[in-house]
């Protein structure tokens, strides 16, 4: 099962450097904290609509593969993050199987819990980078994060209803 927003997310083209953009736009795109928390600060109830979740092989993650360790399998989670039931963000998380050990095994069991609720409670969370992307008038970003030094890649597309616009 797929969703048009996730097709567009995968079409994002990334800037080599942070572009000169409006301060408010950069504030959203370069946010280091939880996007879930930012949405809740808008006075909204945040929920997850699950699109796809499960193990995939390298051929299903061509955009992410150069940014992650080469492994036989990866945990893929594709969601819509909704505010008061309206989709504000499409998210795609790719986790190498080697990351899924110890406490990080919980990444497979998030269900309808927003990823940010898990990530930003961890004292071991670090971020290697944020890249800004754009496709057909929509903005997105991707970040390689680490939990206990173990990598995962998070890509987010801000949908038209998002307060980013």
UniProtKB/Swiss-Prot annotation:
GO terms for molecular function: chorismate lyase activity. It catalyses: chorismate = 4-hydroxybenzoate + pyruvate. Pathway: Cofactor biosynthesis; ubiquinone biosynthesis. GO terms for biological process: pyruvate biosynthetic process; ubiquinone biosynthetic process. Pfam families: Chor_lyase. It is an enzyme of class 4 (lyase). It is found in: Cytoplasm. Its EC number is 4.1.3.40. GO terms for cellular component: cytosol. Gene3D superfamilies: Chorismate lyase-like (3.40.1410.10). PANTHER family: CHORISMATE PYRUVATE-LYASE (PTHR38683:SF1). Removes the pyruvyl group from chorismate, with concomitant aromatization of the ring, to provide 4-hydroxybenzoate (4HB) for the ubiquinone pathway. Monomer. HAMAP family: UbiC (MF_01632). This is Chorismate pyruvate-lyase. The gene is ubiC.
């Amino acid at each position: 099962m797929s969703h048009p927003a996730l097709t567009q997310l995968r079409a994002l083209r990334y800037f080599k450097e942070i572009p000169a953009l409006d301060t408010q736009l950069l504030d959203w795109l370069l946010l280091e904290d939880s996007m879930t928390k930012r949405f809740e600060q808008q006075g909204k109830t945040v929920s997850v609509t699950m699109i796809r979740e499960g193990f995939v092989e390298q051929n299903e993650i061509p955009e992410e593969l150069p940014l992650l360790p080469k492994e036989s399998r990866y945990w893929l989670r594709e969601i819509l993050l909704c505010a008061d039931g309206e989709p504000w963000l499409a998210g795609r998380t790719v986790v190498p199987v080697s990351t899924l050990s110890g406490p990080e095994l919980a990444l497979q069991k998030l269900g309808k819990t927003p990823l940010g609720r898990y990530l930003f409670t961890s004292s071991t969370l670090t971020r290697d980078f944020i890249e800004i992307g754009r496709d057909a008038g929509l903005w997105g970003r991707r970040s390689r994060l680490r939990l206990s030094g173990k990598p995962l890649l998070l890509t987010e597309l801000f949908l038209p209803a998002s307060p980013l616009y």
